[in-house]
């Protein structure tokens, strides 16, 4: 099902007597894109490849830097080289939190070049540094709290990698 219908995230079939079948579909959300040798690939919150697109179709999606897809195929989870495999896992955690917290539309670039301290551009004003792939849900909670306490004119870096606290550096 998933290779033929890549935008299906989950499918649940339930049967009710006497002769009724209900199919419930949960749709994948196009969230970001990665660049491969053959073009651009759209990924969902689980790093599943949804489709190959041209540069003109990338509007509204976050660019992912630092991961190069290996043999990308529609409907399959993003595969990267052995060294980049942890980056894909971390990317899925980041995208999942962005979707859950309705923050995806404010992210333009996710940089996984440094797997131990990836970051992303948020709201065009902040560079967010995440640190190691641990407590991701907690870090995004701290990020939302920090952003809510800053003014609309504040710009700079929010570092979530130190001491389980959000550190803001203006600039």
Per-region residue spans from a language model:
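Amphipathic, non-transmembrane alpha-helical segments in extracytoplasmic/periplasmic proteins
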Residues: 1-6
């Amino acid at each position: 099902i998933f290779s033929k219908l890549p935008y299906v995230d989950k499918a649940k079939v339930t049967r009710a007597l006497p002769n009724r079948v209900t199919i419930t579909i949960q749709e994948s959300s196009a969230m970001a894109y990665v660049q491969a040798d053959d073009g651009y690939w759209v990924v969902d919150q689980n790093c599943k490849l949804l489709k190959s697109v041209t540069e003109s179709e990338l509007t509204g999606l976050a660019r992912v830097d630092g991961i190069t897809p290996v043999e990308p195929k529609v409907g399959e989870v993003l595969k990267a080289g052995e060294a980049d495999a942890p980056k894909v896992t971390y990317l899925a955690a980041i995208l999942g939190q962005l979707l859950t917290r309705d923050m995806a539309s404010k992210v333009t670039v996710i940089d996984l070049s440094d797997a131990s301290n990836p970051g992303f551009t948020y709201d065009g004003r902040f560079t967010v540094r995440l640190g190691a792939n641990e407590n991701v849900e907690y870090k995004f909670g701290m990020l939302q709290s920090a952003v809510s306490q800053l003014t609309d004119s504040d710009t700079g870096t929010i570092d979530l990698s130190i001491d389980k606290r959000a550190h803001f550096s203006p600039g």
